[in-house]
């Protein structure tokens, strides 16, 4: 009787001990949405989004966007990034592997392959919008006065681009079997794994992604060449020549200001009238 009793006493702790050992240092399924994980995600969102505010203040004063335009531009990107983030969290919990490692791999693929896909998508949409002359769907242009419908349409287009990007990245993840890669296995502390996956690595990568994607989505200033071409086409009918000057301040509505040939001739005539009395005084030896 002692034998069976001893066997039972030795067998009872062995099960729980092995369970604890197998789970030690592992990022369990659902850990990304636990309280600590949610706290890290919120902190990351605030810190990473603040880089867009820094970018705005670093823009030249005559090109700096008003706060309302800046908010409309960046809110589209924030919605797109939230979609990618929660898609990664959902996909990470679909596997029996370490969800923290799979989330990190997903995130790094979004920051490399995904960035290229976003750029291609934005350019393709831009070409389509120009071809169809959909004025309200040009990224960064919301009409004057601002139209909420323009923002909604652009936001919908950007979400379609993000769905395309995430679908391609997910296919790449499945084909290359990267879901079996355990990048964080050497780290034993699960909270440290969460901090690396949700805060440390994403902070630097998200700051770079926000900065670059904002350049994709913001309204580009009209170039001098485009304005000259447009002005030449307009004024060729009138037979007049035009020239352009750079805007001296942000208050002027366009970064390139058209000056008509008539205005330039009036300025030159006024200067010539001022020089004539001076020339006559020099001719007769009178003091100027």
Curated annotation (Swiss-Prot):
Transmembrane segments: 29-49, 69-89, 102-122, 156-176, 194-214
Record membrane topology: Multi-pass membrane protein
Domain of life: Eukaryota
Cytoplasmic compartment spans: 1-28, 215-288
Residues in the signal sequence: none
Region span, Required for localization in the endoplasmic reticulum: 241-246
Principal localisation: endoplasmic reticulum
Official protein name in the record: Store-operated calcium entry regulator STIMATE
Source species: Mus musculus (Mouse)
């Amino acid at each position: 009787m002692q034998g069976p009793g001893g066997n039972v006493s030795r067998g009872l702790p062995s099960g729980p001990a092995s369970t604890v050992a197998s789970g030690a240092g592992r990022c369990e399924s659902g850990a990304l949405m636990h309280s600590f994980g949610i706290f890290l995600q919120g902190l990351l969102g605030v810190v990473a989004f603040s880089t867009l505010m820094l970018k705005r203040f670093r823009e030249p004063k005559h090109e700096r966007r008003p706060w309302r335009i800046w908010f409309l531009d960046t809110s589209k990107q924030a919605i797109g990034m939230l979609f990618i983030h929660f898609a990664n969290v959902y996909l990470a919990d679909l596997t029996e592997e370490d969800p923290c490692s799979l989330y990190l791999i997903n995130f790094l693929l979004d920051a490399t392959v995904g960035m290229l896909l976003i750029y291609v998508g934005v350019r393709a949409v831009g070409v389509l919008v120009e071809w169809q002359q959909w004025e309200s769907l040009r990224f960064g242009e919301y009409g004057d006065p601002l139209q909420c419908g323009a923002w909604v349409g652009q936001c919908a287009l950007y979400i379609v681009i993000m769905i395309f990007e995430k679908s391609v990245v997910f296919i790449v993840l499945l084909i290359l079997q990267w879901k079996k890669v355990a990048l964080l296995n050497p780290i034993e502390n699960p909270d440290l794994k969460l901090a690396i996956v949700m805060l440390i690595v994403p902070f630097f990568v998200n700051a770079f992604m926000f900065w670059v994607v904002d350049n994709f989505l913001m309204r580009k200033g009209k170039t001098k060449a485009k304005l000259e071409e447009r002005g030449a086409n307009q004024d060729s009918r009138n037979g007049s020549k035009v020239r352009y000057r750079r805007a001296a301040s942000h208050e002027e509505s366009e970064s390139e200001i058209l000056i008509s040939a008539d205005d330039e001739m009036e300025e030159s005539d006024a200067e010539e009238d001022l020089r004539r009395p001076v020339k006559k005084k020099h001719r007769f030896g009178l003091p100027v």
